Structures are given as C-alpha cells and as structure tokens.
C-alpha cells in the first residue's frame, strides 16, 4: 500500500513525505489547466494499451466510460483536486479510480511515466495557446491597418532619436508597427513545426518494453510525428523557451507601440486623443485622461521578458534526462499566455479607438527643418556631389534657424548665397506634401507605397490566419 496518499509513488518508502516536502512538491494550483489534455491523452493511451494486448475490450470500454464521466465533471467544475493531490496526474488518477475502481483504474498507468506524460500535455496545451495569442496579435494588426486606411494621406513628423527627422505618412508609421507583429505570428506558425512532436511512449526516459506504438499515439493526439529520442523527448523544454521568447517579443513590440501612443496622447505632442472607454482618470486631478492600457503594456513587457529569462535560467544546467527542476517550466509560460490574453484585446481596442489630430501633425511635420534632406537630394539630382549637397543643406538650416524661419521662407538671394546651385526651382521640394510624395521607392512613405504596404499587411494577416487554422 502506498505511503504517500494523493501521489503516484510510495511503495519503496517506509514513511510518507514530510509536510514541507508535500507543500514544496504540490503543483495542482497551476497545472490543473492541463486536466482536459491529460484526459484526452488517457483516452488515447487506453486504446493503445488495448491494441498492445494489455487490456481486453471490457476493460478498455470501462476505462473510456470512466474517463468520459471524469471529463464531464472536470469541465463543469464538480471534480477538482484535493489538498492531498500532488499534481494534475495524481488528481485525475484518483478521480478515475473513484469511478471505475482501483483494479481497472490502476491499469491505465502501464507504459507511461509522468515524464513523458507532462512533456506531451505541455506541448498540447502550448500548441493551442499560441494560436490564441496569434489571433490576438492579428487583431492588433487589423486595428493598425484600419487606422492606416483611414489616414492614407495624413502627414506627420517622422522621428529618429525622438527628434524631428523627415515628414512621413501616419499610415506608414502605423504599418511599421504592424509588420513586427506579423513576424511574431509567423514565428508562431514556424514554432509549431518543432512543438508538434509527441514525447508519449518515451516512459521515464528509456522508452517502453510493453509493445506500445508511439507513432499511433502521436497521430491520435494530433501530432504529425513521435519523438526520435526518448531521452530528449522527456528532458527537452526548448519548445517552451522558444514560445516564451515569442511571447516576450510580442510584448516588446506592443510596448514600442504603447510608447508611441503615450507620447502622442500627451499635451506636448497632441497627435492623438484617447477614447473615454479606453483610458482612465485620476483620483485627485479631475482633468486627467491616462493611457493606462499603453502603460500596462510597457509594464507587462518587462514581466514577460522576466518569464523568458527565468525559464532559460531553470534549464541551463540540468543533466539529462528529466529533473524535478522542470516543475518550474510551466508557470512562466502559463503566465505569459495569460498576460497576453489580457493585453492583446485591450491594445487592439485602444488602437482602434484613437482619434488623430490631423491638423496638428500636419503643422508640426516641417518643424525642426525636416525638409533639409529634400534640399540635399534635390541638389544631388542636379549633379552636385552628396557631400557638398549635405553641407549646403546644413548651411541652409543654420541660416533659417538664425532668422527664426522655416527653410521654405528663405529668400532666393539667401539660397543663392548658400550655394549657386540652390536656384528658385528648389522650392518644388520645400513642402511636406512634395517631400512625402517623392519617397516613392519600395517601402517608402509616398501615398502610392503606403497603399501597397497596407495591401501587403492585410494579405499577410489573412494568410497567417489560414495557416493557423491547419
């Protein structure tokens, strides 16, 4: 008889575990989310035991009926882990034995270890979870694309080093936030190639001697393939680290978008206004409208980076094969998914609800002498070496700055004094509209290019949705 109630081991021990060990080992408070996957795997395992001749038809059918009943009770919340259950596996075995008896219920464990079991369940859960995250990321992409379509001709100051640089289209800038998220979703699609390998049948580490068929088990569980090496299958968690990286990267990309929104909605920038439903107020300052969603996006990005770093640190020095350290592999990943499932719809709603101050952005677009590059490139088109053109444009900025005027306000005489090549025809490029329209090379900010970029973003988003449905 086991000396360890609620666990799957104990016969070798003359005494049960200490209370401190039980408390330390317990994982049902976080691994219960794997319960539906555990039952699904147990159904497939029951059928595999039958095919291997280890169960007769009556035993197979009895186990499957018990598992079906247990699944219903788990789904409606009438079956939950007890304080004595060590983990999700122990809790579900207890529930099954309660329904079919110890003799029949005790047969299910043949040929499997918690090592291959949990590695498989984690992969099953994660393959579903990444699809939910990807769908949320694509909702943010849609919101960015819709705003870009709405503002196809809106001009704004483009910045580098947070200093005014060149005029660009707002659509161009918004789509620049969409592309990283599309790459993140592409990583999720690619990730599945490595996650979709079943460890089931690997046992504790050495494989099974009971005539089980890992390939058939993999197929039953929706995996394209079974693992090639049972030691690697039970010990590897690079799939979890890869997912944690993608989650952290999504959070970082959202954080960069959030930072723009925080700046744009400030009084000093005044580019955008927050919708009442997607912002908060102050407990003491009545006038405040705070970008809490964006600020929480910044904060949560740090949390997800920490989850990735913590998981990698857990993995870094473990010898093969399985070690109990791997109990710590799931919480960081579970948390990252949970945070993104909160954050992504909030960010999509925030972006979709932004109202842009088109007039202010247009007025600020030439500020900071953002047309200086256009002067230099106009001179290059006249045959002037770029080094000389750059010098002349810089001098024009210094002269205009000294007079407190814009580049377009310099007189013909002042321009000629700077460089004989600066004829009155240079005024063709001294408008923000002309500057933006001239950037018509692939990927540029010209309206024609921004329209193509919008088409590409929407097409890529639709293609990724189709891939995620496979």
UniProtKB/Swiss-Prot annotation:
Recorded catalytic activity of this chain's protein:
2-(N(omega)-L-arginino)succinate = fumarate + L-arginine
Q: Name one GO cellular component term.
A: cytosol
Name listed for the protein in its UniProt record: Argininosuccinate lyase
* PANTHER family recorded: ARGININOSUCCINATE LYASE
Write one Pfam family the protein is assigned to.
ASL_C2
Top-rank taxon: Bacteria
Which pathway does it operate in?
A: Amino-acid biosynthesis; L-arginine biosynthesis; L-arginine from L-ornithine and carbamoyl phosphate: step 3/3
Give the organism, scientific name: Mycobacterium leprae (strain TN)
Localisation per UniProt entry: Cytoplasm
**Top enzyme class of this protein?**
lyase
Cite the entry's keywords alphabetically.
Answer: Amino-acid biosynthesis, Arginine biosynthesis, Cytoplasm, Lyase
